[in-house]
Amino acid sequence: VDNAKRKGPKYSLEEGGLTVTEMKRFIVVMTVACALSGLLMLQASFGTLFQLEPICLIILGAAAIGGAIKYTLGSNPYGYRGLGDLSVFIFFGLVSVLGAYFVVAHTIPSMILLLPAVAIGCFSVGVLNVNNIRDVKSDAGIRVTTPMRIGVKGARIYHTALIAGGW
């Protein structure tokens, strides 16, 4: 839960621009829009949704949506327990790059495609890490992030490794 001490851009819910009910409705609308666009993409690519490949991708997409929701919502959000980096690396790096390749090429990605997947994953985690470094003071006692576990100096070294790993 963010508070007034948090640095960075203001959020609609935090500032009172949206009510909790409006935010929940917005989440539902965006989830449905994402699911429908994913289904349409799979239908266009595979010509059906009722084969093994599209079904596996539907399950993977549902896991990604569920992971996004559980990241900060619910009684025990994993993004506040220091697991956000791993999730971002998996979903924004490996799943997005390798999944997109599979949707287009209809073939299992070769090992060489792990290179761009890992690069995108590293850069994505780098964005998260910069935000978490910025919020170390305001997050204290509220959530646990990688910079809180390893300290700001360690997080800067980690960030350098992420960016270097992406290159």
Language-model features and meaning:
Residues 87, 91, 119-122, 126:
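Residue-level hotspots within pore-lining transmembrane alpha-helices
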Residues 93, 162-167:
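Hydrophobic membrane-spanning alpha-helices of multi-pass integral membrane proteins
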